[in-house]
Amino acid sequence: MKRLLLLLPLAVLLVGCGGSKSDNQNASGGSSMNCEISGDKSKANLIDLGNGKHSVAVKTSKGDFTFDLATKTSPCTTASFAGLVDKGFFDGLTFHRIVPGFVIQGGDPEGNGSGGPGYSVVDKPPADTQYKKGLVAMAKTQTDPPGTSGSQFFVVTSDGVSLPPDYAVLGDVTKGMDVVEEIGKLGNPSDPAGTPTEKVTIDKMELESG
């Protein structure tokens, strides 16, 4: 069983995903996006966000934060994530991995780093991508191609984090970074598995536009 883990010594994020591939998967509304979908395509509900400004409000048991979606850099990733938000996929899930000074990680319906939505998409990030504090990105298995994503995401909680440009960029935190930082303290620094010291629930995610 593959798990989505952020291994500190190797700086690797893992998450289970896989399946057949299909090109020309349009988002809802007849978009012109050309997104490759692997896995169960019937579970994919990609929402074409176009060029407008869109963000996701994350309401947690420890407070709220908001991040803008990187629609230009990652059109397929953001379209997939928006579709998951729209159907309430994340509501009630937890931040199952918290590594102080590194990341908080959530979006796994299994709650142990092995789950996902049943499909994945790909947006290979730019070669000069830097995973700075407040950046939100998607996790993948060590063997998946760069930019592969399902539903598991992470938020970088500290500057100076060194990761290769392999993880699809989802967006940047614009509000509530203090909440992210507080959540980021609820882990054991000596535990690379990132087992939280306190349960943190994603009560609800909401897609916002404009």
Regions found by a protein language model. Name each.
Residues 4-210:
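Cyclophilin-like peptidyl-prolyl cis-trans isomerases
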